[in-house]
């Protein structure tokens, strides 16, 4: 069997800078069922479909990118968040460049994108943080734009990270996966057979679980975290402001001009749980009183660095989600693909490592052949 990843990079799939996937007419003998229509499920399905695989994507909701993929800060990372984990930084840096190349219409530039290191509250001083980023090969400039008032920080840099465009992404993947999508379809059973895997009785050569442990258990220790972000309305030209490194906060724009999210490392979590079901119950059962209390804490925290925050922004409402995170204090959000028989499980902390995931799956299928 030919090397599938080599064919992919040589362009037989037509994936290029115009955000276009075309099938070259060559049919691959393998079929894959993919569970979960988030960023990873959609990208893996579209890539394999373009390579000639027979693919079906199962998503329990009526639209794609409905769960954690559509409820986050919508940041396309370059690695600046991860001063304490080199593997995550390098995957983010490389994944960012590939994402912009392959999906140029699914993100946009954030004109003023600030990372600031607090004087007292950061786990790293500014010069150490700067040295780590410089050695990682990511671009940045030092100093804040004119007119931005940030207090209690040791140093500031501006970075070229982007914001994801969720509405365009949904439309794009729905078109790219036309005929291969099962929306509103919750998978009831997966059974291994002698020569494949059955999803609700339908046969596939391989199955990819892209639900982050919401369907099948993962092969590493994780926790499921119910989360709360807050939406605010503010000046469209206001910069993104991210405080690093440690238990800090950030203000980041969304795809809608003038709408931002506020996130806080200590206050965004609603609780950590051993099972996805427990985390979903906590998310769905959060009370208005809890949201109000969390909002007060998050606003107090961000105003230590942006003292005019409440004068500049108006609260709109909450964003609720469940995240899957590996256990450990070392800040690992790198991408992993594990295999049990003919079933693959994907686990990653960030959108920018989607390319690593599909490459690893192709490699494992090649090994099987």
UniProtKB/Swiss-Prot annotation:
Top EC group: oxidoreductase
Documented EC number(s): 1.14.13.-
InterPro entries in alphabetical order: FAD/NAD-bd_sf
Cofactor(s) demanded: FAD
Protein role: FAD-dependent monooxygenase; part of the gene cluster that mediates the biosynthesis of the gamma-pyrones fusapyrone (FPY) and deoxyfusapyrone (dFPY). FPY is an undecaketide and thus likely synthesized by the polyketide synthase FPY1 from acetyl-CoA functioning as starter unit and the addition of 10 malonyl-CoA extender units by successive Claisen-condensations.
Family assignment from sequence similarity: Belongs to the aromatic-ring hydroxylase family.
Protein name according to UniProt: FAD-dependent monooxygenase FPY4
Organism: Fusarium mangiferae (Mango malformation disease fungus)
Taxonomic lineage: Eukaryota, Fungi, Dikarya, Ascomycota, Pezizomycotina
């Amino acid at each position: 069997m030919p090397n599938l990843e080599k064919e992919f990079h040589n362009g037989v799939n037509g994936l290029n800078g115009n955000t276009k996937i075309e099938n070259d007419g060559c049919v691959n003998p393998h079929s894959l069922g993919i569970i979960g229509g988030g960023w990873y499920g959609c990208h893996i399905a579209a890539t394999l479909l373009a390579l000639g695989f027979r693919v079906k994507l199962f998503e329990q909701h009526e639209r794609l990118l409905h769960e954690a993929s559509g409820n986050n800060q919508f940041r396309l990372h370059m690695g600046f968040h991860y001063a304490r984990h080199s593997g995550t930084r390098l995957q983010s840096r490389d994944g960012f460049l590939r994402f912009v190349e392959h999906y140029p219409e699914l993100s946009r530039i954030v004109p003023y994108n600030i990372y600031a290191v607090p004087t007292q509250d950061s786990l790293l001083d500014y010069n150490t943080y700067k040295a780590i980023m410089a050695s990682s090969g990511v671009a940045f400039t030092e100093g804040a734009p004119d007119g931005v008032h940030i207090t209690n920080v040791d140093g500031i840099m501006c970075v070229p990270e982007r914001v994801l465009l969720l509405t365009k992404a949904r439309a794009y993947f729905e078109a790219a996966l036309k005929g291969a999508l099962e929306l509103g379809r919750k998978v009831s059973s997966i059974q291994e057979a002698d020569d494949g895997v059955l999803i609700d009785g339908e046969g596939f050569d391989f199955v990819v679980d892209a639900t982050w442990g919401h369907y099948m258990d993962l092969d590493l220790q994780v926790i499921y975290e119910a989360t709360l972000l807050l939406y605010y309305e503010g000046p469209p030209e206001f910069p993104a402001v991210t405080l690093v490194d440690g238990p800090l906060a950030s203000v980041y724009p969304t795809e809608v001009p003038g709408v931002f999210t506020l996130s806080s490392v200590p206050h965004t979590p609603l609780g950590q749980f051993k099972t996805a079901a427990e985390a979903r119950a906590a998310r769905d059962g959060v009370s208005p009183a809890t949201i109000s209390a969390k909002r007060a804490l998050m606003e107090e925290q961000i105003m230590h660095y942006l003292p005019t925050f409440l004068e500049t922004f108006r609260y709109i409402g909450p964003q609720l989600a469940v995240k899957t995170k590996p256990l450990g204090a070392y800040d690992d959000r790198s991408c992993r693909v594990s295999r049990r028989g003919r079933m693959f499980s994907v686990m990653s902390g960030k959108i920018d490592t989607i390319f690593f995931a599909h490459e690893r799956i192709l490699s494992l299928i090649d090994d099987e052949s």
